[in-house]
Amino acid sequence: MARKCFFTGKGPMVGNNVSHANNKTKKRSLPNLRTVRVKLEDGTTVKLRVAASTLRTMKKRS
C-alpha cells in the first residue's frame, strides 16, 4: 500500500539532515496518514488512507 493520501495525493518528501560539520545525509519525511472509514451513499463503508491535514480541511468545509 502506497504512502499517499487518497484525496490529495500527498506523499513522502526527500530532504537533507545537515550536521554541524555540514555533512549531508538524505532523509524522508512521511505524510501523517490516518486510516478513515467513509460511508458511501449505498450504505457500504470503505477504509481510506487520508492525511491528517486533509481530515482537518474536510471537517472545516463540511
From Swiss-Prot:
The protein, known as: Large ribosomal subunit protein bL28
Domain of life: Bacteria
GO biological process: translation
GO cellular component, one term: ribosome
NCBIfam families: L28
Database matches in Pfam families: Ribosomal_L28
Origin organism lineage: Bacteria, Pseudomonadati, Campylobacterota, Epsilonproteobacteria, Campylobacterales
UniProt family annotation: Belongs to the bacterial ribosomal protein bL28 family.
InterPro entries membership: Bacterial_rp_bL28 (IPR050096), Ribosomal_bL28 (IPR026569), Ribosomal_bL28/bL31-like_sf (IPR034704), Ribosomal_bL28_bact-type (IPR001383), Ribosomal_bL28_sf (IPR037147)
UniProt keyword annotation of Ribosomal protein present: yes
Keywords: Ribonucleoprotein, Ribosomal protein
Sample GO molecular function, one term: structural constituent of ribosome
